[in-house]
């Protein structure tokens, strides 16, 4: 009995002790929370706001606030300041709100956000700035928002989006830039760094050209509606291999070029409603293997041969939604019919025509090459390579690609590329093929037996009459070859020229080198001729200067030229002697002005000498006796005779 009482008491104590321990633990937890709250300061809700959920949600909407109110609790996780008159966000305004996750500043009059305005918001997940007056993107204010996932900037008068505008928030997953009606410029690097972005809204931004979206490698949803895209070209969505939803509604699109959607391999939903589309290129949606939702309604579709492939594709891949893709607008007898109801029996269609067929090409190794194949824009183009590979615009090859116009492009040809290449053009009525031979020679060797002829082989395939009543299906193209129902082959010999062996392959490179060599020769010749003319002119100038200097020197030398003086004795007082002297005069002296010389008694008295310059004639310094009459002459008579070399002075 005693043992039973002890067991009962033991169980009773255990039953009482457990609730006591539990209540004690709860009291301690409550005390700790109170102490923590006391240490953090008093948690009071601003008088102009309403708070709930223990101050974690603060709502201050429609209070006419011109600035962020003071005293917002530090444990706030949700702050709504929408529909006020806040004009500026100053730095460190929210510095104490470390737990804030959602900040709503939409529908204010914010014109400026200072750098550091969002400092301290390490936990911020969503930032709403839509319907404000921002003219620039406040990139500097996004610093340190390491957990930001959503950014709303819709309906602001932003004029441009510069490069790296959002690179400070690489964690961003949703970006709303819709209704930027003042937007005029988007930089090529505007979206650099947003490799985590999943959703982008650029609707109603007055965009006329598709911006560069290549950095958005992870983008899954793209809204481009309400813009002005007359055309959608290939490469517009380059790099968006992860895109799943694309909306281009009400954007005035009138033309979508073939291969425009080739890069969108993951696309699931495509909306092209409310545009100006009348037809689509053949097999436009073939690369979109996962496309299950397509909207083409409210477009002026022209139901002719170019629309047959689309009608078949809609019946084949979207059988449950016949009203998704609109009705025929033309011709009149087809107006109002759904696209899925259009069949081939209503039309007489022909196979596509190759307007510019490829031509045989001889080329050296390691060079670029192209084989053209220009076709109607509503047809599809594929190329069959010599090894059996079929390439389209969407195919990937390290060196060979199909351009948008159907041209087969080689970034670098190799010897193994030699062979026949076939361009295969397809529309709903049939196929047309054109082949060309590519001959690749070694860069170091000349190609022997080269011929300049070009052979173009064109094969046209049309649907047989038996196939008209059957449902249209695309003709499969395999590497083993193409099997047409009706085939006509036409070989056109453009030109034939027999050329001897050992003729080098004419190439653009050789022609360029010859042209360059000729230019160098002409340039050198011009330089030589110019130098010759310059030297000739210089020599002529030097000759003229030399002649003038020599003439001036001769004129100056006449002053210092030597003089010859002849002194002749004359006796005018003896007439008899004059007649005798005339008889004895030499026969060489005659004519007007001749002087009759007196008889010379002494031959030694005839003197000829050259006096020094400035000599005086007052006396004779020779010491010889002269005729007595010489001394009776009062003044000497000077006769000067000028010659080229000297001046002779004669004293009479």
Curated annotation (Swiss-Prot):
SMART domains, A to Z: IG (SM00409), IGc2 (SM00408), LRR_TYP (SM00369), LRRCT (SM00082), LRRNT (SM00013)
Post-translational modification: N-glycosylated.
Any one cellular-component term (Gene Ontology): excitatory synapse
Keyword tags: Cell membrane, Disulfide bond, Glycoprotein, Immunoglobulin domain, Leucine-rich repeat, Membrane, Postsynaptic cell membrane, Repeat, Signal, Synapse, Transmembrane, Transmembrane helix
One Pfam family named in its UniProt record: LRR_8
TM spans (from-to): 527-547
Bilayer topology term: Single-pass type I membrane protein
Reported function: Synaptic adhesion protein. Regulates the formation of exitatory synapses through the recruitment of pre-and-postsynaptic proteins. Organize the lamina/pathway-specific differentiation of dendrites. Plays an important role for auditory synaptic responses. Involved in the suppression of glioma.
Protein name, entry field: Leucine-rich repeat-containing protein 4
UniProt organism field: Rattus norvegicus
